[in-house]
Regions:
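Extracellular/oxidizing-compartment recognition motifs
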Residues: 1-259
């Protein structure tokens, strides 16, 4: 069956510094090289959507949502505990089957260049690919995929690796650029796809911070995790949260993340 999706990225004329990236963190990024690109597309059907089979990949690291629900992250980490100096020989694709409802299907993807973990491995440039077969209530199937009809933007709220600042401008949406000479050779991953599970810290609890007050809360986990931080907060004004992470037997903190 003919491939439906095309590799897309930010427009190369408007974003010349956010095209290429190091193949691994062993190769330092150039100034202006870091980028959190976002891609979106809405599909409206006559009949209700029942389910979707999705094939998706991104370079270097991607996160996919459908109808505001988390689908997955990837690609499966092909690297190891070493620094790569050559582009990744194969780029793995993730495959998902998800249930749907309603006549509207919305995709949103975030793709980061360069990688930030030692096992992240790249072809040396940013890209995103998705194709899906959507089953409708009348029994018909619609095949869709990424192309120049998707929208793209560089989200300025991610100014640096591991930093998110809601106060910054997310940036305008613009037509995605369809990459004319893709460098990726997609292969089904021979290892399990990445997965998310919610892990509560030991002794997790709610707490209240008064206006103008600063509080420091320390929590521990039962072991080391590769994780992202999820916070639930109700605020009545500006609020800055700084989280730092360290191993229990180390005195120095890892880089901070501003939320």
């Amino acid at each position: 069956m003919e491939q439906q999706g095309k590799w897309i990225w930010l427009d190369r004329e408007r974003h010349p510094l956010e095209q290429d990236c190091p193949v691994s963190i062993a190769n330092p990024a150039r100034p202006g090289n870091y980028c959190m690109a976002e891609f979106r597309r809405t599909y409206d059907f006559r009949w209700e959507a029942v389910s979707a089979k999705i094939r998706v990949s991104g370079d270097t690291v991607f996160r996919l949502l459908c109808n505001n629900r988390f689908v997955g992250v990837g690609p499966a980490a092909a690297g190891g505990d070493f620094g790569a100096n050559l582009p990744m020989p194969r780029h793995f694709i993730n495959e998902y089957e998800i249930d749907l409802s309603g006549v509207r299907v919305e995709f949103l993807a975030q793709v980061q260049i360069p990688g930030s973990a030692l096992c992240d491995w790249s072809q040396g440039r940013g890209g995103f690919f998705l194709e899906a077969e959507i089953l409708l209530e009348d029994g018909s199937r619609r095949r869709i995929g990424t192309g120049s009809d998707w929208e793209a933007r560089r989200n300025g709220r991610y100014p640096a690796p591991d930093v998110y600042d809601q106060r910054l401008d997310g940036g305008p949406w613009e037509p995605a650029w369809e990459i004319d000479e893709p460098v990726w050779n997609l292969t089904p991953a021979p290892i399990p796809m990445l997965d998310f599970q919610t892990v509560q810290p030991l002794g997790a609890r709610e707490f209240v911070v008064g206006a103008g007050e600063e509080r420091v809360i320390s929590v521990e986990f039962d072991r080391i995790y590769s994780a992202c931080l999820r916070l639930y907060a109700e605020v009545t004004g500006p609020c800055e949260i700084t989280a730092s992470f360290r191993e229990l037997d180390r005195a120095d903190d890892f880089p901070e993340e501003i939320v």
